[in-house]
Amino acid sequence: MPVDSLVGKTPESSAGIHGWGAYVPVYRIPTREIARVWGWPDHQWKALDVYEKAVGGVDEDSTTMGVEAARNAIARARVDPASIGAVFFGSESKPYAVKPSATIIAEALGITPVTMASDLEFACRAASEGMRASIGLVASGVVGYTLVVGSDTAQASPGDVLEFSASSGAAAFVIGPSKGAAAVFESSFTYVTDTPDFWRRGLKPYPSHGEGFTGEPAYFHHIESAVKGLFEKTGLSPGDFDYAIFHQPNGKFPVKVAKKLGFTMEQVKPGLVTPFIGNTYNASALLGLVKVLDVAKPGDRILVAPFGSGAGSDAYSLIVTDAIEEAKPLAQPLEYYLKRRIEIDYGVYAKIRGKLVVRKL
């Protein structure tokens, strides 16, 4: 469908992505190193299809990474930061329990003081909530532009299976009117239930997971339901999309859910990120979207389906416009951050991520 004929046909089509950006820390720890330290057999960690994960430095947290990703998004959007009317920050690993990170990001980028700013919560789907809210704010004319940031320095208990994948990274998007957007939203659909698959209680450093709930009842059920709901709402089918991106808790799940929904590996592979940097939680599916936007061509149709434990999934259909070609070179692509790496061992990883606790005798 030509973009001009799309605009105004759905509520979502009045909004689009003007800028996108990524940030991934330079440090990497191979999953084989984690397995070596804890004695995991090869077949268990290799089954996850995660080769190494990104590790935030001692001076990096979800907010600092969010600022870096947002700078790239704003550079591509070519908008005055002061014109951004709302900032949404989605994270499971905020540096403060009580103090918004969205205001820190807004202040650092010159967006404050005349703006809305909120930290959102819905496990790995929090940033996607911000994207859905942004579509409504922009399409209704309440604000001209919004900034959506998904960023995490994901936690995992030492020796837990989550430690193979829980990683660090950030993605950001400037959402604005469809005119001039690099990609226009065609439609969206959300599906949520109360499912106890993954949680972290207050004052606890590491999350818990109900292993029997993490697969079919949570991840697969919710993503499949959201995507099928989008198909029913729009009349689209897998063959109508050039790219398909799903939340990536590991390298295995997104490929499996894609096949179950009828997508091919050719549609999925360009957006896979987790095998190379691990699961960046709120940035997981969104970094996949960044990776695809870095290479997409005008007229391409993109499906993206983030997921958050607890549990829920959104499904979006976007159509790329001619404006994408001018925006691409204005910031570093995700591939730059994927290739920029310093390998570390478990000792360095444990030290910089605060896993070592020293007690005085």
UniProtKB/Swiss-Prot annotation:
Catalytic activity field: acetoacetyl-CoA + acetyl-CoA + H2O = (3S)-3-hydroxy-3-methylglutaryl-CoA + CoA + H(+)
Binding, CoA: 252
Pfam families the record matches: ACP_syn_III_C (PF08541)
UniProt: (3S)-3-hydroxy-3-methylglutaryl-CoA binding residues: 124, 165, 214, 247, 256, 279, 309
Domain of life: Archaea
Active site (catalytic residues): 92, 124, 247
Molecular function as annotated in GO: acetyl-CoA C-acetyltransferase activity; hydroxymethylglutaryl-CoA synthase activity
Top-level class of the enzyme under EC nomenclature: transferase
Phosphoprotein recorded as keyword: no
BP terms from Gene Ontology: isopentenyl diphosphate biosynthetic process, mevalonate pathway; secondary metabolite biosynthetic process
EC assignment: 2.3.3.10
Annotated InterPro entries: ACP_syn_III_C, HMG_CoA_Synthase, Thiolase-like
Family the entry assigns: Belongs to the thiolase-like superfamily. Archaeal HMG-CoA synthase family.
Function of the molecule: Catalyzes the condensation of acetyl-CoA with acetoacetyl-CoA to form 3-hydroxy-3-methylglutaryl-CoA (HMG-CoA). Functions in the mevalonate (MVA) pathway leading to isopentenyl diphosphate (IPP), a key precursor for the biosynthesis of isoprenoid compounds that are building blocks of archaeal membrane lipids.
Protein name per Swiss-Prot or TrEMBL: Hydroxymethylglutaryl-CoA synthase
Natural source organism: Aeropyrum pernix (strain ATCC 700893 / DSM 11879 / JCM 9820 / NBRC 100138 / K1)
